[in-house]
UniProtKB/Swiss-Prot annotation:
UniProt superkingdom: Bacteria
Keyword Lipid metabolism tagged: no
Spans through the membrane: 7-29, 44-62, 69-88, 108-130
Subcellular localization(s) per the UniProt record: Cell membrane
Name of the protein in question: Uncharacterized protein aq_125
Species this chain originates from: Aquifex aeolicus (strain VF5)
InterPro entries tied to this protein: TMEM205-like
Keywords associated with the record: Cell membrane, Membrane, Transmembrane, Transmembrane helix
Protein's membrane topology: Multi-pass membrane protein
GO cellular component: plasma membrane
Length: 132
């Protein structure tokens, strides 16, 4: 039962992250001015990463008996979410107004970390599916 709940939480987070990252954010930048789209994304993504910390943390606890690979991926996933939420995102906010070139560099790093988070989440989902 615990693993099914972990699977549900991770699947929800994977769907949410994929939807925001690959549909909502790009669409905002297509239909709104860059500043407006950026203002929306600045509000949405910290909530997304914060929710990820909670969901991935709970799933890590619930799936603690799912093997070393699941735990390793879960710990790395959680660390990357914490890095995004508490280091990268605040750094991006500070740089946007002061050094746009450096902001773009950190934005690229942030996108890479987000992709890694989604892939790690997918890996844990697959582990739980095929473990059954």
């Amino acid at each position: 039962m615990k693993e099914k709940l972990a699977l549900a939480l991770l699947s929800f987070f994977l769907g949410l992250g994929s939807f925001f990252s690959f549909y909502v954010a790009p669409t905002l930048f297509k239909v709104l001015e860059r500043q407006q789209a950026g203002a929306v994304v600045e509000k949405v993504f910290p909530v997304y990463f914060g929710l990820g910390i909670i969901l991935v943390g709970i799933s890590l606890f619930l799936g603690r008996d799912s093997g070393k690979l699941f735990l390793s991926l879960g710990i790395l996933n959680l660390l990357l979410l914490l890095l995004q939420e508490f280091i990268v995102i605040p750094k991006l906010h500070g740089l946007k107004a002061t050094n746009y070139e450096l902001f773009l560099k950190y934005h690229g790093v942030s996108m890479g970390i987000n992709l890694a988070i989604l892939l790690l989440t997918l890996g844990k989902v697959l582990i739980l599916i095929f473990k059954r």
